[in-house]
Structure formats: C-alpha cells, structure tokens
C-alpha cells in the first residue's frame, strides 16, 4: 500500500480501531515479496483476518510494482514458501475464504478453462504440502481425481538432446 505496506502495521491499526467490523486482508505476495517475516500472522486472531490472497512468484530483482503486476504465479511455481505462510495463517485460526491473486501476462492470454484447472491443481498441491508440514492427516483432503487426458506435457532439464 501507499501508506501501509506491512501487515503488522495494518494489524496495529485494526487493533487500535477496536471495531468488530474491521479486520485485515493478508496477501502472500505483498508480505513475502518485501521480505516480511510471516510468523507474526499467528498473533492475529483468526476472526480478525477477513480475507486471504495467495500468489507465488519467481525471485526477481525488480521494482515490486512491476513484479506484482506481471510475474505472479500459482502456488508451488515460484520461490515463496507458501506452505509455511499458509501454516501461519491456519495456526492463527483463519478458516475463511481465499483467492488466488495471480497477475501474469501469460495467464491473461491463456484459455480460461486451462488456467482454472491449473489454479485448482496448485491449490491441491498447496493443501497437500501444508497438511504434510503440519503433520495433519491427508485423509481429510479429497483424493486427486484420475486424469482423463493430458493437454500438454512439460519437461525441464539439461542436455535433453539426442
């Protein structure tokens, strides 16, 4: 934000206002891109976290505004530790809605059905990793559906030539 760019500062404002209808929105990109320690999220009562926005991003050395508007990724595709971030949020007691706030030039040009499937896979991945890290049973999570088809296959590696 222009005047408040640290979630801890935002939380202090909410505390001082002491209003039942005022809370905070946590945005993983804004917290992690600025290098803020997310552990203090656990000091915010879950009922005072009103919304959660998630995005991953590659480690880039550039202006945060440009980075934010053009290079966000789905969870698990960047360098942010979203598993730890989400763990802090859940330990705070948050059980409300979340959104993927992924601003990315490539996704803007991609078929929306493919992008939605990609988003769902990333959330399933994040739920699985977060449950494993917390030692929770993954039995309570919906099992992954068997694939019906493949739209594309992507390989990454070195020396893939003949």
Q: Where are these predicted regions, by residue range?
A:
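Conserved anion-binding
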Residues: 1
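Histidine-acidic metal/acid-base catalytic patches
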Residues: 4-26, 32-162
